[in-house]
């Protein structure tokens, strides 16, 4: 007990000499209060972190909900047996940034995977005591029993037209969806298979994964069970994903984000290679087989890359089809342009006479990406390249006008940027 008292005395009073303590007894009390205040603040931060973590990371809830519906025969999929019966899907690190969209790293069939599952309804257990039944009724309500395969095909085609636009390539995409639904290859689509695929199509990212499956820079879809799905893992996600826990990411200012990126990010030539991949991804989104797509949250959080520094889009949640963005914005009431926003940064002009948003976006994908690349590429750039690179990125960020009307200029600027970066790294080991 005496040793404990001595230790406390040393910790709390050591900074002051005995003479100073005698002359200034008030300082002793202030110092003790300061120490206890530090302990309180630290404890509060730990509590907030873990309460946020428990809210963000609820993969166990997701698995319980999905497996409950699988065992009832409501849903099916290529991963269901391994997930719910054989326990061969291993959940590892929580990567979620929002409670309603659960994201985990994992292992399946000896492959590193990313597990994604939405649990919006299941999280509302206080407001909805019957959360699981409500989820199956709302999310897995279509198609209904008795729907023919022809009706399901037409239903799927109509859904794709509404979300991607009326494109000649859509019937081929419907065939691909029906082929995926028949995961057990018995040449028929059961009601459970149809319900699962229909629920998956309601997930924006899943629809994007299907549309961009042939593209080099989107993650490959590996399997699903109900509306839970697995994609190939991106070995190196965004820089702050590796450095920070999800609950702390929104708390840091952008200046500190950039500083951390410099400290923990790859060397400049590797960053140049990743940037080239990001520019190629912008090309892939522009007038592809299934229309044009807009990036509506352009941040370093979405910049992922493989072990060989090839760019992979880490998150497609904020990439939206042109038809979806137009439908949301066109005719929407507005007083100013700031009222016409889809996602975080897809902005349309406001017709102040009609007080309605227009459907065309003001800033194209490339301008937003170049703004991002200024912070990503200019720090640490070779001295002989710095001025020209800065000039081209400034030109690129000033691309304006309606996103649908800048095609020629867009392509020219993008080509110049890619050429400049490739020229710098093409004759080195970094290429």
UniProtKB/Swiss-Prot annotation:
Among the many cysteines in the lumenal domain, most are probably involved in disulfide bonds. Residues 1-30 are cytoplasmic. A motif (May mediate ER retention) lies at residues 5-6. Disulfide bonds join 57-94, 62-117. It is found in: Endoplasmic reticulum membrane. It is a single-pass type II membrane protein. InterPro entries: FAM69_kinase_dom, FAM69_N. Residues 52-431 are lumenal. It comes from the Eukaryota. Pfam families: PIP49_C, PIP49_N. One of its GO terms (cellular component) is endoplasmic reticulum membrane. The chain crosses the membrane at residues 31-51. Keywords: Disulfide bond, Endoplasmic reticulum, Membrane, Signal-anchor, Transmembrane, Transmembrane helix. Belongs to the DIPK family. This is Divergent protein kinase domain 1B. It comes from Rattus norvegicus (Rat). The gene is Dipk1b.
């Amino acid at each position: 007990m005496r040793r404990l008292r001595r230790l406390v005395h040393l910790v709390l009073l050591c900074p002051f000499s005995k003479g100073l303590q005698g002359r200034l007894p008030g300082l002793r009390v202030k110092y003790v209060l300061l120490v206890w205040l530090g302990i309180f603040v630290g404890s509060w931060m730990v509590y907030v972190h873990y309460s946020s973590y428990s809210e963000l990371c609820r993969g166990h809830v997701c698995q319980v909900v999905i497996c409950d519906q699988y065992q009832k025969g409501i849903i099916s999929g290529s991963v269901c047996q391994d997930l719910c019966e054989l326990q061969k899907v291993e959940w590892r690190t929580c990567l979620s940034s929002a409670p309603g969209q659960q994201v985990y790293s994992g292992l399946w069939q000896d492959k590193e995977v990313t597990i994604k599952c939405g649990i919006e309804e299941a999280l509302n257990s206080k407001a909805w005591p019957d959360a699981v039944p409500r989820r199956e009724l709302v999310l897995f309500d279509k198609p209904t029993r008795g729907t023919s395969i022809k009706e399901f095909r037409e239903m799927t085609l109509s859904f794709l037209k509404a979300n991607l636009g009326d494109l000649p390539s859509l019937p081929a995409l419907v065939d691909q969806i029906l082929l995926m639904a028949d995961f057990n290859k018995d040449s028929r689509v059961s009601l459970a298979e149809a319900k699962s695929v229909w629920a998956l199509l309601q997930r924006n990212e899943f629809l994007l994964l299907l549309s961009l499956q042939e593209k080099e820079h989107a993650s490959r879809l590996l399997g699903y069970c109900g509306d839970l799905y697995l994609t190939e893992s991106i070995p190196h996600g965004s820089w702050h994903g590796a450095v920070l826990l999800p609950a702390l990411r929104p708390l840091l200012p952008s200046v500190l984000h950039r500083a951390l990126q410099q400290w923990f990010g790859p060397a400049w030539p590797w960053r140049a290679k990743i940037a080239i991949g990001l520019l190629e991804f912008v090309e892939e989104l522009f007038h592809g087989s299934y229309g044009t797509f807009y990036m509506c949250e352009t941040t370093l959080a979405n910049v992922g890359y493989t072990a060989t520094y090839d760019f992979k889009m880490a998150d497609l949640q904020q990439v939206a089809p042109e038809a979806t963005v137009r439908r949301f914005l066109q005719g929407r009431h507005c007083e100013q342009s700031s009222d016409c926003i889809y996602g975080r940064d897809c902005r349309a002009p406001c017709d102040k006479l009609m007080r309605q948003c227009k459907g065309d976006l003001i800033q194209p994908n490339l301008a937003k990406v170049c703004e991002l690349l200024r912070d990503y590429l200019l720090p640490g750039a070779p001295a002989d390249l710095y001025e020209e690179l800065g000039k081209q990125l400034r030109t690129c960020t000033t691309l304006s006008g309606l996103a649908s009307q800048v095609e020629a200029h867009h392509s020219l600027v993008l080509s110049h940027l890619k050429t400049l970066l490739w020229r710098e790294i093409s004759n080195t080991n970094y290429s």
